[in-house]
């Protein structure tokens, strides 16, 4: 049986990291062009035991991506699937260990190469260690990816019953936590928490003012925190990081962000 850490890590990759492929295929011009007019079904799966598997699948219709957690059970054939023999093997692959290659089930080689182009682009983007210089477009894309990854990752850990995260969520009234870059509403993500339940969302939370918002003055400042190259206290003093809400909640959310990051590294 897989360890709790293995299960948590796999869920973050399956339900928080791999769904970023939709954003990358949509926001990176050369990839968006590659999928113009394309219809395809893709899947990534990992065996849990002899009968069960974890999976995420992607349905591309005329170039537009949708992401679905779980196995594809439709009538069409999957064009390409990366099928891992275990969650451990998938986790190693996602962390860059090329010794844990999946079984590749390919119906259409052309569509497979397009899918791999997006997966490789995601890998290269999430491997960037320093904020890009003089490239705001790339910096904003990276912020969006990390905001989506972290909000979804924390929510998924809660849903799995991670002791630290779920205990916090159980005690929480109806609250919304948000990540944002000032002046760029398209680069925003949130997580709503209430009595043990949670839901991550993309874009600004519209129903009410967020209970807490971790806002950055620009994408570069955000990346300094997200990539661990900036000093949080100094940046807060310089108003590069603005915590809209009680600072103790910022520390709490920061701990869960680091938890997601540690599992995914």
Language model region names:
Residues 1-265:
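Feature captures hydrophobic
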């Amino acid at each position: 049986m897989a360890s709790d850490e293995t299960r948590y890590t796999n869920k973050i990759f399956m339900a928080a990291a791999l769904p970023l492929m939709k954003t990358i295929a949509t926001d990176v011009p050369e990839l968006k062009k590659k999928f113009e007019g394309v219809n395809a079904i893709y899947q990534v799966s990992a065996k849990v035991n002899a009968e069960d598997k974890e999976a995420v699948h992607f349905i591309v219709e005329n170039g537009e991506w949708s992401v679905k957690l779980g196995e594809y059970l439709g009538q069409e054939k999957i064009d390409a699937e990366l099928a891992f023999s275990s969650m451990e093997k998938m986790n190693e692959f996602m962390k860059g260990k090329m010794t844990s290659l999946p079984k590749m089930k390919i119906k259409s080689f052309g569509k497979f190469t397009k899918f791999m182009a997006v997966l490789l682009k995601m890998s290269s983007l999430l491997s960037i260690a320093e904020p890009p210089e003089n490239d705001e477009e790339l910096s904003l894309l990276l912020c969006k990816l990390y905001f989506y990854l972290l909000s979804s990752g924390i929510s998924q850990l809660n849903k799995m019953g991670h002791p630290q995260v779920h205990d916090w969520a159980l005690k929480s009234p109806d609250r919304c936590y948000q990540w944002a870059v000032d002046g760029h509403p398209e680069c925003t993500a949130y997580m709503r928490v209430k009595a043990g339940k949670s839901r991550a969302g993309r874009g600004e939370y519209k129903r009410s003012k967020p209970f807490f918002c971790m806002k950055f003055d620009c994408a570069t400042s955000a990346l300094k925190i997200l990539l661990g190259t900036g000093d949080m206290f100094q940046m807060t003093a310089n108003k590069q990081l603005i915590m809209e809400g009680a600072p103790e909640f910022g520390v709490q959310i920061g701990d869960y962000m680091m938890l997601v990051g540690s599992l995914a590294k």
